[in-house]
Amino acid sequence: MKPHFLAVALVSLVLSVAGAVPFAQAPGPRPDTVDLAAIQLIKDEGLQRSQVMDTAWNLTEVFGPRLTNSPAVRAAAEWAARRLTGWGLANVRQETWGPFGRGWANEMFTATVVAPQPFPLIAAPRAWTPGTNGPVTADIVAPNIRTDQDMAAWSGKLDGKIVLLGAPVDVRPLFTPLGRRFTGQELADLETQPINAGRGRGGRAGGPANADFNQRYMQYLAKEGVVATIEPASGRNDHGAILVTGSPATYRDTSPPVVTPQIVIASEHYNRIARLLAGKVPVQLELNVRNRFFDQPLDAFNLVGEIPGTDRADEVVMLGAHFDSWHAGTGATDNAAGSAVMMEAMRILKTTGLRMRRTIRLALWTGEEQGLLGSRAYVKQQFADRDTMALRPGHAKLAAYYNMDNGTGAVRGVYLQGNEAVRPVFASWTEPFNNLGMTTLSVRSTMGSDQVAFDEVGLPGFQFIQDPVEYGTHSHHTNMDVFDRLQAEDLMKNAVIVAAFAYHTANRETLLPRKALPRARTAETR
């Protein structure tokens, strides 16, 4: 769905402007100067000759899902490096970090119920799980094992079976659309300061014990000779979408615990099977899963490239997005969209020939989906150790890090990560894009992506506020995260905005204001 206001905004986006003028600002810190002539060049290149969708298409449909340390992510990175080099970026390279662990790829997957009536399943294997060593047909059972006593009672009865894990999912009808834009009220709410009114709700007791039982249960199923396990999708997405990530079995261990093939299926299909079994109707499944592990190399990498600066080339502005994805779809909204936008922003800046005083560096991370591993390794090597807060020389030289990882939606503003001092600066840089819907500066911090790796060591790391579109409702980590979910106009506009922010950060007289340095994590645990 592409609202009419976006088409109108894009028609009016390229304006004939020139010169550098400061924007009006309420009394307080002096606003930054905005180079409108540079913005005009950036808009013209980014909206008239964009390559962002071609980049996204290559990442998603030519190379497919880009699981960390898989052959596909390495092939995609080699292609991206060639593209960046062809655009004229300097120092394009893969920087190794790790060790990460084994690579993995699914090479074949079919799952069809063959009795009592045949129907194919919407399903996918969990990453880093084994295959079936060829096609198998087996009865499905629902033992409902919850305790060690249950395991003892079922011992010897599960050999050659396929086991259901978990209860049926309550699938709700859709009374609201899957895709949406932020409303004015929602954006206004983001600008308010969050208040912690109390201690909050404590964590649920028994978590570690449950995790320990689950690990023992999976090993028990493998020992009992179970053919495979089947579990429902999370219930968050439903309606044909399945959310699939990795196995609890570690990818870091070259000799991990033996587990069975693990399959995630659509909630509707899971519920049908569970109801048949509850009605004493036998169910048989034909399954063929071919998964492959790659034990070399065990180290992963980040892809880096630069546009060198001039008189302040030792100072750096960074743009980043995670390059890795999960595997059920092709990693389009999460996060080929962000990677393509950041690559396109670099192309725009290089093609326009604009002069940047500071070096602009692009970093495409891997290991984000496993816990910001690539970006945290880079920050520790280049800037600071988050545990001890021992600073490296590069810490004082980073002007800012800008991250893109909120799907395909249009940029509506910036999360300031609690850095109120940067508000007047960003207000000036945002104003030329107000008519495109970029109006919001939220003091709130947003978590869960690579800007956190910078923010947690006191560096100015920022994430853009983006329209949700279908990100949390349909595409995030699902089999539906494919090229068709991408919104071309939004990605084109986002690349222009990122390029403008990078340009102004690179040419600002001083570095962006920073928050106070956080305490060392080791000190907090004493």
Q: PLM features: what roles do these ranges have?
A:
Residues 37-38, 114-115, 120-153, 249-332, ...:
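Soluble metallo-hydrolase cores and metallopeptidase-like ectodomains found primarily
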Residues 8-20:
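Bacterial N-terminal signal peptides
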Residues 39-47, 61-72, 138-144, 152-153, ...:
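Second-shell loop/turn segments in exported
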Residues 33-70, 241-242, 324-325, 400-409, ...:
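N-terminal capping segment at the start of a domain
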Residues 26-38, 57, 61-198:
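Noncatalytic luminal/extracellular "stalk/propeptide" segments of secretory-pathway proteins
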Residues 116-120, 133-138, 156, 160-162, ...:
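Metal-dependent peptidase/peptidase-like ectodomains
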Residues 23-30, 197-208, 236, 526:
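Disordered, low-complexity segments in secreted/periplasmic proteins that are enriched in proline
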Residues 205-210, 215-218, 222-223, 228, ...:
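Active-site-adjacent substrate-binding region
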